[in-house]
Regions:
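Short, charge-patterned binding micro-sites
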Residues: 45-67
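N-terminal, positively charged regions that mediate nucleic acid binding
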Residues: 1-44
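Glycine-rich, mobile lid/loop segments that gate access to catalytic sites or pores
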Residues: 10-14, 49-55, 82-168
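Short, non-transmembrane amphipathic alpha-helical segments
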Residues: 26-29, 34, 77-88
């Protein structure tokens, strides 16, 4: 074996206008709309967007369980995207236009198999199919005075720092 390449970490941090930000905003708005109907609603909705000059698509998929009539998911998605500024097909999406922006909704009620694991009292309640995400503290940022005290992976701290400067 010859010389080996040392391992490297990468990280991503996106700015306003990135499709991930729009997708998160739409999914958050759907959650908010469901919680207005039923404060105990269970919502697992993912959003995907793809826009090109002249045509765009918003795809909503997932599972929702709530007591009451569900919100109009397409209306929530269009309103959220247009309130952010996606109102011109020349910039990739006109969410106000039925002609230039399609919304595909694939949202069903929660599977009975998952539901039975999360129904019941808090002592025996499971997590269903939702994952648990976690981070970790480390000393990588301690060697950089401006980042000291964050106890964060250096690659992630630098990615966020660059993003903040781009948004100024």
């Amino acid at each position: 074996m010859g010389d080996s390449i040392p391992p490297s970490d990468t990280a991503e941090s996106v700015t306003a206008g990135h499709p991930d930000k729009l997708c998160d905003a739409i999914s958050d708005s759907i959650l908010d709309a469901c919680l207005l109907i039923d404060p105990n609603a269970r919502v697992a909705v993912e959003t995907m967007v793809k826009g090109t000059e002249g045509q765009a698509v918003i795809v909503l998929a997932g599972e929702v369980s709530l007591n009451g009539h569900p919100p109009n998911y397409e209306e929530v998605a269009r309103h959220t995207a247009s309130s952010i500024g996606y109102t011109d097909s020349r910039i990739g999406m006109d969410a106000t236009s039925q002609e230039y922006c399609q919304v595909h909704t694939h949202i069903t009620t929660q599977s009975q198999f998952i539901s039975q694991g999360v129904d019941g009292d808090l002592e025996t309640q499971g997590a269903g199919d939702q994952g648990v995400m976690f981070g970790y503290a480390c000393s990588e940022t301690e060697g950089t005075p401006e980042l000291r005290g964050r106890f964060f992976p250096l690659s992630a701290a630098l990615a966020q720092r660059i993003t903040r400067r781009l948004e100024i």
